[in-house]
Each structure stands twice: as structure tokens, then as C-alpha cells.
């Protein structure tokens, strides 16, 4: 049995203003009012209304951060609790710490830009923006709630809007992509429900699903391993982890630009956040044994997805596999037992959210002009679309982790954190870093070759016949500019973001390290421990954890 102190999960700071509840209820309430908004049929009033609601939501989250959040504290802040169904221990409990506050800000920020990106939508605009606002509230709830059953409900709430946005406004294979998405995500979420019920009713004490209560429960190692495995499958689908990733290229291949931004910018981050919140924070004994598997899966993500992206001729699918590759670094950071590596994973999620949203928006803008996604049918449009080419170039350089961009800082932190993590043997660290570096090398190869095929060379006859090969319009420049400001800002001054979650990450890693050190017979053979580790994999003079 693993015993540890509840670090960073006690003594929550109460909210003086219910900012988090407002950030959830405003977009959901705004969505419910859309049927009553007068409109002349073109959706103009609906678009402006939805944009105002998303901007208000963004301002609420900013106000929450500026007035009620202290980055130096590791525990919960902006805490609200209202009894809901006390018979089964269910309460409306919301709060924020370093794991959730940055992602809440990211969600409201990207959703407001996605709403602006949806300006050309004229087919059923009332339903489209209703779903977009409902998705905004559901995604913020995923990061803000502090009750595992509420988390499950919020997790399910955002699935239906995504399904309908794909099925109604997607491409030719939209029904297939939407059905595959709902089967993967809804099916895997069953593991979340089972784990929530098991953790809420077992482990001693009064039945409760609040994170603070679950962290204080006394779960056996076997119980933790079982729950961890189920949650890893559920969150691995959303991250996604290879081989649970196949829904993502299909979804991105059929989605519209604003839905792209929400998928890449926010949806994938829900999986990474949930791994940190539940698998690492609430199940530390199991995490100590599963961590090497996360590292290996991260490397598989990086290399497999990078190679697959290199071979893609469809622009959307190429960027989709690039996203999967970049999320592999998040797995390596989560699997490390270092503050630097885990902080890098958190920063990588934020960085990829911004960069992924920008790239997919540009994919949609380019398709609106060329009416093709096949690289073989593109080429030579750089002379006619110079501003668009400049935007593409800057965003691609950010994706390949150019120094001065946020991606460079996050990947460097992950590499440095894992390379210096003495919880793993030196040969294992060398092999993993070497393999992950292959993905770093492949990224500029497929991204720069993609730019060459789109913008350079001789213009195809089919494209030359198009009269709408116009350059980027002010709305598009504004959206990319808004995304590039934090990308470059974080790249030049990382503390702009890392200070917001460093205290919570330190508490989380301390908790996991304590659990690892108390393992007397670790089943993970590549972690330093007793007995089962082969001598060739042991680093010399690293000592042996003190048995309990």
C-alpha cells in the first residue's frame, strides 16, 4: 500500500466572485438563447451575437485569472461548492489550479477566434453557433470541475456538438468521420464512468467524487493499476495515443476551419490534462509503474506520426498526423519524474493548441481559395498570395520548434527534463532521447516540403483558372496575428506562461516521486528499483529506494 501526503489538493481558496461558474454558464446560456435571436436569414445577427458571447466568456476567464488566481499557490483556487445530489455524494464543485487555469484561458481564447473564423458559415448558422457555444461551455467545464462525475458529464457534453459539427458541415465523408469519432470517444468514455464509480464508492470513507476526497482515499496498488489502465485508454483516445488515433485524421479530413481549431486547439488537450489530473495526481502508485510505458508510447507517437505525415498528400491529413506527433512529446513529459519535464508537457499542450489552431485555420483558408486539399494539385500560388505565404511560413516555423517560438521552449524542457531524470537508467534515457530526436528532424522536412509544394513551382492550370486566388483578408490576418502573439511571447519569455502552473507541477511531481520511492518491487523494469531491473539497464551508484 502506498502512503503519501495530499500535496496541493487541500485548503482550497474560496471564490469571492463565481468566475468559473460564469465561464461555464454564460456560453451554455447564450447557446440556449440563440433560437430567440431575430435574424434575416443570412446569419449576420447570429454571428455577431455568438462572437459577443465568446468574447464575454474570454473576458470572464481573464478576470478570474487576474483577480482571483495566485500562481504561487499549488492548491485549488476560485473554489465553489454547491450541494447537488448529496445522496450519492455529487456536488457542483469547481476550482482552478496550475493544471487547469492555463487551459481554461486557452479554451475561451481559441473559441472566440474560432467563432470569428466561422464568419463565412451561411448554412444553418443558428444551429452551428448554438453548437459552438455549447461546446465552449462543455470544454471549460472539463477543466474547471472538481468532481469526477461532473467531469464525466462535461466530457460527454462536448461530444455531441463535435459530432453534429462534423456530420452536418463536414466534407464528402462527413458521416463516416463523425460516426467514427463518436464511436471512439463515447465508447472509451465508459472507462471514465466505471473508474469514477469505483473510486467514489471504494477506498474507505464517505462516498464522494470530489478530487480532494479521492486523493485522500486509501486505494490499493492493484486497484490503482486497474483504474489507471482504464483511464489511460479513455484519455489515450482523446490525446490521441497510437494506435487509438485513427479517428483524428478522418475527423480533421472532413471538418471545417473553425471545427479544426477547436479539435486541434482544445479537444486534444483534454486528454493530456486528464492524464495529469487523474492518472498522475490521483493514482500515483500506478503512475510510477505505468510511466515507462507512457515514455515508449510517446516515442511511437512522435516517429510513427511524423513518418506518416511525411507520406500524406492530403493537406489536412498531413497536419493532423503532425499534431499526433507533437502530442507524443506531451506523453514523454508526463512520464518523466522531473518538474522540468512535466512543466514542458504542460507548456507543449498550450503551445500546440495555439500552433495547431493557426495551421488548421490556414488550411481552411487555403482550401476556400484553391478548392483542393491535394498537394499534387497545388503549386505556384505564392506570387498571388504573398501575405498568405508569409502567414503559412511563420506558423510552420513555429510548428517545427524554431527558437524564439513557444514550441522550441516546450520541447527543449521535455528533452532536458527527461535526460536529467535519474529515476530512469542512463541507457534508457539515451535511447528515448535519440529516438525522439528523429521526430524533431523529420518535422522540418515534411513541413518545409509542404510549403514548397503549395506556394512554389509552376502554377497548375486548374488553379490558374480560379478567379478567387486572392490574398489573405484582414479577418484572416487578425486571427493568425492573435495566435502568433502568445506563440512568440512564450517563445521569447517562457515565464509568461510557466509561472502560472509551476507551483502545481512541483506539487504533482513531488507526489509521484514519493509514490515511486515507496515501491518496493516496481513492475516497471526501466525505473530504478529493486530486484527485477536487469543489471545492464541500471545506472551505477544511483542507490535503492528505501523500502517501507
Curated annotation (Swiss-Prot):
MF annotations from Gene Ontology: NADH dehydrogenase (ubiquinone) activity; ubiquinone binding
Transmembrane region(s): 17-37, 48-68, 103-123, 127-147, 149-169, 181-201, 222-242, 256-276, 290-310, 327-347, 348-368, 389-409, 430-450, 477-497
Domain of life per record: Bacteria
Broad class of enzyme this protein falls into: translocase
A Pfam family the protein falls into: Proton_antipo_M
InterPro entries in the record: NADH_Q_OxRdtase_chain4, NADH_Q_OxRdtase_chainM/4, NADH_UbQ_OxRdtase, ND/Mrp_TM
GO cellular component: plasma membrane-derived thylakoid membrane
GO biological process annotation, one example: electron transport coupled proton transport
Subcellular localization: Cellular thylakoid membrane
Key words of the record: Membrane, NAD, NADP, Plastoquinone, Quinone, Thylakoid, Translocase, Transmembrane, Transmembrane helix
Chemical reaction(s) catalysed: a plastoquinone + NADH + (n+1) H(+)(in) = a plastoquinol + NAD(+) + n H(+)(out); a plastoquinone + NADPH + (n+1) H(+)(in) = a plastoquinol + NADP(+) + n H(+)(out)
Membrane topology: Multi-pass membrane protein
EC number(s) given by UniProt: 7.1.1.-
Family: Belongs to the complex I subunit 4 family.
Function statement: NDH-1 shuttles electrons from NAD(P)H, via FMN and iron-sulfur (Fe-S) centers, to quinones in the respiratory chain. The immediate electron acceptor for the enzyme in this species is believed to be plastoquinone. Couples the redox reaction to proton translocation (for every two electrons transferred, four hydrogen ions are translocated across the cytoplasmic membrane), and thus conserves the redox energy in a proton gradient.
Stated name of the protein: NAD(P)H-quinone oxidoreductase chain 4
Gene that encodes the chain: ndhD
Amino acid at each position: 500500500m502506498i502512503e503519501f501526503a495530499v500535496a496541493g489538493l487541500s485548503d482550497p481558496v474560496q471564490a469571492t466572485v463565481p468566475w468559473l461558474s460564469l465561464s461555464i454558464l454564460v456560453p451554455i446560456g447564450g447557446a440556449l438563447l440563440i433560437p430567440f435571436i431575430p435574424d434575416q436569414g443570412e446569419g449576420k445577427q447570429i454571428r455577431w451575437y455568438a462572437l459577443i458571447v465568446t468574447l464575454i466568456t474570454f473576458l470572464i476567464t481573464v478576470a478570474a485569472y487576474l483577480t482571483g488566481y495566485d500562481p504561487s499557490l499549488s492548491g485549488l483556487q476560485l473554489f465553489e461548492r454547491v450541494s447537488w445530489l448529496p445522496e450519492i455524494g455529487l456536488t457542483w464543485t469547481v476550482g482552478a489550479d496550475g493544471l487547469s487555469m492555463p487551459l481554461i484561458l486557452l479554451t475561451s481564447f481559441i473559441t472566440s477566434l474560432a467563432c470569428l473564423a466561422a464568419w463565412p458559415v451561411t448554412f444553418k448558422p443558428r444551429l452551428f453557433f448554438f453548437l459552438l457555444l455549447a461546446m465552449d461551455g462543455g470544454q471549460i467545464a472539463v477543466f474547471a470541475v472538481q468532481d469526477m462525475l461532473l467531469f464525466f458529464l462535461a466530457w460527454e457534453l462536448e461530444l455531441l456538438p463535435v459530432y453534429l459539427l462534423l456530420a452536418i458541415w463536414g466534407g464528402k465523408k462527413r458521416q463516416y468521420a463523425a460516426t467514427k469519432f463518436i464511436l471512439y470517444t463515447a465508447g472509451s468514455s465508459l472507462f471514465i464512468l466505471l473508474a469514477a464509480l469505483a473510486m467514489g464508492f471504494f477506498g474507505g470513507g464517505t462516498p464522494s467524487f470530489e478530487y480532494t476526497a479521492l486523493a485522500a482515499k486509501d486505494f490499493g496498488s492493484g486497484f490503482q493499476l486497474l483504474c489507471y489502465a482504464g483511464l489511460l485508454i479513455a484519455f489515450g483516445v482523446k490525446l490521441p495515443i497510437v494506435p487509438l488515433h485513427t479517428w483524428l485524421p478522418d475527423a480533421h479530413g472532413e471538418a471545417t476551419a473553425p471545427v479544426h481549431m477547436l479539435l486541434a486547439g482544445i479537444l486534444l488537450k483534454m486528454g493530456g490534462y486528464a492524464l495529469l489530473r487523474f492518472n498522475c495526481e490521483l493514482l500515483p502508485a500506478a503512475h510510477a509503474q505505468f510511466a515507462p510505458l507512457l515514455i515508449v508510447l510517446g516515442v511511437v507517437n512522435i516517429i510513427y506520426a511524423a513518418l506518416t505525415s511525411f507520406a500524406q498528400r492530403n493537406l489536412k491529413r498531413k497536419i493532423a498526423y503532425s499534431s499526433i506527433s507533437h502530442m507524443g512529446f506531451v506523453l514523454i513529459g508526463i512520464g518523466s519524474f522531473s518538474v522540468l519535464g512535466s512543466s514542458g508537457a504542460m507548456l507543449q499542450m498550450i503551445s500546440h493548441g495555439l500552433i495547431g489552431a493557426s495551421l488548421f485555420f490556414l488550411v481552411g483558408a487555403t482550401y476556400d481559395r484553391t478548392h483542393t486539399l491535394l498537394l499534387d494539385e497545388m503549386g505556384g500560388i505564392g506570387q498571388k498570395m504573398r501575405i498568405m505565404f508569409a502567414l503559412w511560413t511563420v506558423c510552420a516555423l513555429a510548428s517545427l520548434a524554431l527558437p524564439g517560438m513557444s514550441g522550441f521552449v516546450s520541447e527543449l524542457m521535455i528533452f532536458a527534463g527527461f535526460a536529467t531524470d535519474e529515476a530512469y537508467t542512463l541507457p534508457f534515457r539515451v535511447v528515448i532521447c535519440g529516438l525522439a530526436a528523429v521526430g524533431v528532424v523529420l518535422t522540418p522536412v515534411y513541413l518545409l516540403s509542404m510549403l514548397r509544394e503549395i506556394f512554389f513551382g509552376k502554377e497548375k492550370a486548374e488553379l490558374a483558372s480560379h478567379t478567387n486566388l486572392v490574398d489573405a483578408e484582414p479577418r484572416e490576418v487578425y486571427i493568425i496575428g492573435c495566435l502568433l502573439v502568445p506563440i512568440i511571447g512564450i517563445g521569447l519569455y517562457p515565464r509568461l506562461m510557466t509561472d502560472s502552473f509551476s507551483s502545481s507541477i512541483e506539487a504533482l511531481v513531488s507526489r509521484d516521486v514519493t509514490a515511486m520511492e515507496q515501491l518496493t518491487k516496481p513492475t516497471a523494469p526501466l525505473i530504478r528499483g529493486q530486484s527485477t531491473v536487469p543489471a545492464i539497464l541500471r545506472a551505477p551508484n544511483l542507490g535503492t529506494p528505501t523500502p517501507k
